[in-house]
């Protein structure tokens, strides 16, 4: 739903910000995404909030990444022009209870394979790495960002370490599940696969 994604992230947010001007809120927290960074080069990993990004505007996930980038610009304008007290958070790979098994992220995908008695399929050589942030830790970060007296700021919410490879993550999930599943490595013909998904 690329057009609906753009409408929700941009037009929906604009309407919400306009409405907020009538109520003089003490604070607004906008949830952006780490995907606005695109594919940082090795000099920008871990990725700082000041990194402008390296995003592909032409691909299947571009509507999400680019609409979030434009949404951040809207937040900046409303803070700068109208002094609306907005802060922005960019979540990195949160996980924990309540994660939808069908949401397409790596941890639920791996568990879904196991629950269906299937092997875990990794569409790479398994060496790519990620860091993960437990949801209660992320919520602490979100709350601190919301309550901060400094407004018009951007905060990455995630962990710098430890990194884990997709291969090791798959084997860890197999081990803690006492599963007989195996890890199977495949290639993906989609050139956009694993893009715009910063490590940390």
Segments and roles (model prediction):
Residues 1, 98-102, 195-197:
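Short, solvent-exposed loop/turn segments at secondary-structure boundaries
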Residues 48, 93, 112-200:
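C-terminal substrate-binding subdomain of Rossmann-fold SDR/epimerase-dehydratase oxidoreductases
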Residues 63, 71, 103, 166, ...:
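Conserved donor sugar-nucleotide recognition element shared by glycan-biosynthetic enzymes
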Residues 70, 74, 78, 110, ...:
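Hydrophobic alpha-helix immediately C-terminal to the catalytic Tyr-X-X-X-Lys motif of short-chain
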């Amino acid at each position: 739903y690329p057009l609906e994604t753009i409408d929700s992230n941009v037009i929906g947010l604009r309407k919400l910000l306009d409405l907020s001007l009538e109520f003089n809120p003490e604070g607004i927290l906008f949830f952006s995404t780490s995907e606005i960074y695109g594919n940082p080069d090795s000099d920008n990993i871990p990725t700082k909030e000041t990194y402008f990004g390296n995003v592909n505007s032409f691909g299947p996930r571009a509507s999400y990444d680019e609409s979030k980038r434009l949404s951040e610009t809207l937040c900046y304008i409303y803070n700068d022009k109208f002094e609306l007290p907005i802060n922005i958070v960019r979540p990195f790979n949160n996980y924990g209870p309540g994660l939808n098994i069908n949401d397409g992220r790596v941890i639920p995908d791996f568990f879904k394979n196991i629950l269906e008695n299937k092997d875990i399929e990794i569409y790479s050589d398994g060496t790519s790495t990620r860091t993960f942030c437990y949801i209660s830790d992320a919520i602490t970060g979100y709350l601190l960002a919301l309550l901060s007296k400094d407004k018009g700021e951007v905060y990455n919410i995630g962990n710098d370490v430890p990194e884990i490879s997709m291969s090791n993550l798959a084997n860890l999930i197999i081990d803690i599940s006492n599963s007989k599943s195996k890890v199977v490595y495949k290639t993906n013909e989609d050139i956009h696969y694993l893009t715009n998904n910063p490590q940390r």
